[in-house]
Structures are given as C-alpha cells and as structure tokens.
C-alpha cells in the first residue's frame, strides 16, 4: 500500500472500515474517474494523456479477460 498516495490509502481505509461505500464495479468506477481526468481540459496534457492511457489499458484488459 505504501506505493500509493496518502489520499488513496485514506480512502482505502475508509472503504475497508465501512465508513465509505464500496463500489462492486471497480473497473467501471476507475474508468469513469480516469475518463473525467482525460476530458478535463484544465489539466496539463501529460496528466490527461496518462489518464487516457490507463483507461484504454483497463478497457483492453476488461475485454481480454471476458
């Protein structure tokens, strides 16, 4: 867990403790978040590209795994 940001670790702890709701469709949740980052024109292009690349890889892995 230490490789992840403090915010990710905090949300993980909140979900694990039941303080924050768990979303069963984790890939769908991640894709929505990554797509929102990729679409945000106020963010630096490098950040948007990184999010788009991660989302595309999730889409490919989701279809390959089915």
Curated annotation (Swiss-Prot):
InterPro entries attached to this UniProt entry: UPF0253
Domain of life: Bacteria
Disulphide bridges, residue numbers: none
Family: Belongs to the UPF0253 family.
UniProt xrefs under HAMAP family: UPF0253
Alphabetical list of NCBIfam families matching this protein: PRK04964.1 (NF003436)
Name of this chain's protein: UPF0253 protein NT01EI_0864
